[in-house]
């Protein structure tokens, strides 16, 4: 359990509560969660050691045009890691549902409204793209870059989070490599529901022992934090124990409630080169 799971900032969230579903536009449904909650726990109190974005994909986005004809789209939202807040996912879903029976003049108006409301909730300007289903149909399903570290013949008996599993994981050889795992699983901070993801780790520096890295990632299996918080924890732990000169951590989680969340943190560029979905998304 995370140290801040009982924080007062989480007490009023709709997550884990019985809620009414509104089909009329209502921006007040959005609920922020201060990023400072987990960053204080990670001693990230000053300048951040990374840049990045939380990339959300909205698969259940629909509204009415001025003739009352339903419109459907697939949307993308890029929320800067520097924003004051992350957006709580159930409130995001309820907010999107409030578009369902609301008329908008055109697609641009929908994009503008989403941008305005999500920026206000995050506390910083976000980027929103609204795509037609036809355009999105041509997007390929991709796999992660680099070597998969999952097929190791190792025995694991503990699933309690333990950052120190990375202690001594940095070897002597200098490398630049990309590794990935599909075994990332954590639990929702509030509801304890499982969150399933894949994570790509690109770095330059002392070569990281793959067994130690896999054991570390598997230790998230019973850990309770939001997606974004887990990725920042992975980033800071690798920096602490392995000290690479360059590091990028990019996780892609399976969708829930018509939304998937793909946090990206890096010492290099502030967003990935693409937002293409994986087989489990």
UniProtKB/Swiss-Prot annotation:
It catalyses: 7-aminomethyl-7-carbaguanine + 2 NADP(+) = 7-cyano-7-deazaguanine + 2 NADPH + 3 H(+). One of its GO terms (molecular function) is preQ1 synthase activity. Pathway: tRNA modification; tRNA-queuosine biosynthesis. NADPH binds at residues 89-90, 256-257. The active site is at 188 (thioimide intermediate), 195 (proton donor). It comes from the Bacteria. Residues 261-281 are annotated as: Disordered. The keyword DNA-binding does not apply. Its EC number is 1.7.1.13. GO terms for biological process: queuosine biosynthetic process; tRNA modification. Keywords: Cytoplasm, NADP, Oxidoreductase, Queuosine biosynthesis. Substrate binds at residues 87-89, 227-228. The keyword Oxidoreductase applies. It is found in: Cytoplasm. One of its GO terms (cellular component) is cytoplasm. HAMAP family: QueF_type2. Homodimer. Catalyzes the NADPH-dependent reduction of 7-cyano-7-deazaguanine (preQ0) to 7-aminomethyl-7-deazaguanine (preQ1). Belongs to the GTP cyclohydrolase I family. QueF type 2 subfamily. This is NADPH-dependent 7-cyano-7-deazaguanine reductase. It comes from Vibrio atlanticus (strain LGP32) (Vibrio splendidus (strain Mel32)). The gene is queF.
């Amino acid at each position: 359990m995370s140290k801040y799971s009982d924080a007062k900032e989480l007490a009023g969230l709709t997550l884990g509560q019985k809620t009414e579903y509104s089909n009329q536009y209502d921006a007040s449904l959005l609920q922020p969660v201060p990023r400072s909650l987990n960053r204080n726990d990670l001693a990230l109190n000053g300048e951040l050691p990374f840049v990045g974005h939380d990339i959300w994909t909205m698969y259940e986005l629909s509204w009415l045009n001025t003739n009352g004809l339903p419109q459907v789209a697939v949307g993308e939202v890029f929320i800067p890691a520097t924003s004051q807040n992350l957006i709580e996912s159930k409130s995001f879903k309820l907010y999107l549902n409030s578009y369902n029976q609301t008329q908008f003049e055109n697609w641009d108006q929908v994009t503008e409204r989403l941008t305005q409301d999500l920026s206000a909730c995050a506390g910083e300007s976000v980027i929103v793209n609204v795509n037609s289903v036809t355009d999105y149909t041509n997007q390929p399903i991709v796999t992660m870059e680099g070597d998969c570290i999952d097929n190791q013949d190792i025995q694991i008996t503990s699933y309690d989070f333990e950052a120190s599993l990375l202690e001594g994981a940095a070897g002597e050889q200098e490398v630049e490599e990309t590794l990935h795992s599909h075994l990332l699983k954590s639990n929702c901070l509030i509801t304890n529901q499982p969150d399933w993801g894949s994570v790509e780790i690109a770095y330059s520096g002392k070569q990281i022992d793959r067994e130690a890295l896999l054991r570390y990632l598997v230790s998230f299996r019973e850990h309770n934090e939001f997606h974004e918080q887990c990725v920042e924890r992975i980033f800071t732990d690798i920096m602490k124990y392995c000290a690479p000169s360059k590091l990028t951590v990019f996780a892609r989680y399976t969708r829930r409630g018509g939304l998937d969340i793909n946090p990206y943190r890096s010492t290099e560029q502030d967003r990935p080169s693409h937002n293409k979905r994986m087989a489990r998304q």
